[in-house]
C-alpha cells in the first residue's frame, strides 16, 4: 500500500525508485557489472583492513586511517549497491518510508565520515613531512582516536540533520523518486509541504563539512609542497611525493564528483548525468580506493608479499 489517510491528507508509505534504466536487456548487463564491482569493493576493502591489522609494519597512523577509510567505503557502497542490484531484477522497485530514511541516513553518515577521514589523512601527511621530529607526539594513538571520533561524530550529526529534515517533509503523492536510491534532492521535489527549512539545513551542514575538510586538506598540502620544494635531496623529494600521491588521487576523485553534484548549478546538468556521477562516487570510487593505495604504496605491497609468503611456506 503506497498511500494512507493521515488527517486531512493522504500520506506516502513507500517510494518507487526509477533506477538507472527501463531497458530490460541493459538492466541485466548493468546487474552483472555492478555485482562484480560490489564484490571487488567488499573483498578489496576487507583485505585492506585485514592486511593492516595483521601486519605489524603497517601499524602507523596513516594505515590506521586507511583501514577506517576502507570501512567507510564498504558502508558507503553497501548503503546503495545491494538495493540497486534488486532494482535491476524487478519491474517496479519500491522502498518503504522507513527504509528510505535508513538508506538516506547511511549514505550521509558514511559519506560525511569519509570527508573527515580524508582530512585526517592529509593532516597526518602534513605532520610526517613538515614536522617529522614531532610526528610521534603529535600523531600518537590518543590523537588518532580523537580524530577518528571527530569523523564519526561529525558523520552522525550530519546524518541527524538530514534525518530530522526528512521526517519533517510531508509526502502526499506522487511517490516516484527519479534516482536509484533515496537521495535528498529528488525527495524534496516530491514534498507537498514547505521545504524552505528542510532544504536549507542539510545543505548548510553538508556544505560546511565539505568546506572545512577541503580547507584542512588544501592547507596541509600547501605546506607539504613548500616543504618538499625546500628539500635538497632528489630521493627525499620523490619519497615525500610518493607518500602523498595515493591520498591526493583519492581526494581528487571523491571531492571532484561531490563538487559536480552538490556545488555546480542544477541547470548545468541533467538528472541522468546526476545519476551517472552518483554511481561513480558511490559505487566505483569505493572499489578504486584499495587499488589506488595498494598499487602506489610500497609498504602495502611489501606487507602483502610477506603475508602471502608466510601462507605459502607455513
Curated annotation (Swiss-Prot):
InterPro entries on file: GPCR_Rhodpsn, GPCR_Rhodpsn_7TM, Olfact_rcpt
Topological domains, Cytoplasmic: 50-57, 124-136, 221-240, 296-314
KW Cytoplasm (keyword) present: no
CDD domains named in the record: 7tmA_OR5P-like
Principal cellular location given in the protein's record: membrane
Membrane topology, from the record: Multi-pass membrane protein
Glycosylation sites per record: 8
Short name of any one Pfam family annotated for the protein: 7tm_4
UniProt-listed GO biological process terms: G protein-coupled receptor signaling pathway; sensory perception of smell
Top-level taxon: Eukaryota
GO cellular component, one term: membrane
Disulfide partners: 100-192
Spans within the Extracellular topological domain: 1-28, 79-102, 158-199, 262-274
Key words of the record: Cell membrane, Disulfide bond, G-protein coupled receptor, Glycoprotein, Membrane, Olfaction, Receptor, Sensory transduction, Transducer, Transmembrane, Transmembrane helix
Transmembrane residue ranges: 29-49, 58-78, 103-123, 137-157, 200-220, 241-261, 275-295
GO MF entries: G protein-coupled receptor activity; olfactory receptor activity
Cellular localisation: Cell membrane
Protein family per UniProt: Belongs to the G-protein coupled receptor 1 family.
Biological function: Potential odorant receptor.
Record protein name field: Olfactory receptor 5P6
Species of origin: Mus musculus
Amino acid at each position: 500500500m503506497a498511500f494512507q489517510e493521515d488527517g486531512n491528507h493522504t500520506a506516502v508509505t513507500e517510494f518507487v525508485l526509477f533506477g538507472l534504466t527501463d531497458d530490460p536487456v541493459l538492466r541485466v548487463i548493468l546487474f552483472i557489472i555492478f555485482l562484480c564491482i560490489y564484490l571487488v569493493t567488499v573483498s578489496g576493502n576487507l583485505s585492506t583492513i585485514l592486511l593492516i591489522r595483521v601486519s605489524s609494519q603497517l601499524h602507523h597512523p596513516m594505515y590506521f586511517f586507511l583501514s577506517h577509510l576502507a570501512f567507510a567505503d564498504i558502508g558507503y557502497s553497501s548503503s546503495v549497491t545491494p538495493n540497486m542490484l534488486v532494482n535491476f531484477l524487478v519491474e517496479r522497485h519500491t522502498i518503504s518510508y522507513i527504509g528510505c530514511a535508513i538508506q538516506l541516513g547511511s549514505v550521509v553518515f558514511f559519506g560525511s565520515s569519509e570527508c573527515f577521514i580524508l582530512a585526517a589523512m592529509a593532516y597526518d601527511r602534513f605532520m610526517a613531512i613538515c614536522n617529522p621530529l614531532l610526528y610521534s607526539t603529535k600523531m600518537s594513538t590518543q590523537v588518532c582516536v580523537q580524530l577518528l571520533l571527530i569523523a564519526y561524530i561529525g558523520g552522525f550529526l550530519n546524518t541527524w540533520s538530514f534525518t530530522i529534515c526528512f521526517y519533517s517533509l510531508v509526502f502526499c503523492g506522487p511517490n516516484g523518486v527519479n534516482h536509484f536510491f533515496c537521495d535528498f534532492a529528488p525527495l524534496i521535489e516530491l514534498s507537498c509541504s514547505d521545504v524552505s527549512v528542510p532544504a536549507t539545513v542539510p545543505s548548510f551542514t553538508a556544505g560546511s563539512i565539505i568546506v572545512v575538510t577541503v580547507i584542512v586538506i588544501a592547507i596541509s598540502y600547501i605546506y607539504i609542497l613548500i616543504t618538499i620544494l625546500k628539500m635538497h635531496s632528489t630521493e627525499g623529494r620523490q619519497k615525500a611525493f610518493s607518500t602523498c600521491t595515493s591520498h591526493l588521487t583519492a581526494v581528487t576523485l571523491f571531492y571532484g564528483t561531490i563538487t559536480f553534484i552538490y556545488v555546480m548549478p542544477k541547470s548545468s546538468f541533467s538528472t541522468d548525468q546526476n545519476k551517472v556521477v552518483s554511481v561513480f562516487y558511490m559505487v566505483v570510487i569505493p572499489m578504486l580506493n584499495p587499488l589506488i593505495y595498494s598499487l602506489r604504496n610500497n609498504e602495502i605491497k611489501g606487507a602483502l608479499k610477506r603475508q602471502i609468503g608466510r601462507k605459502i611456506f607455513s
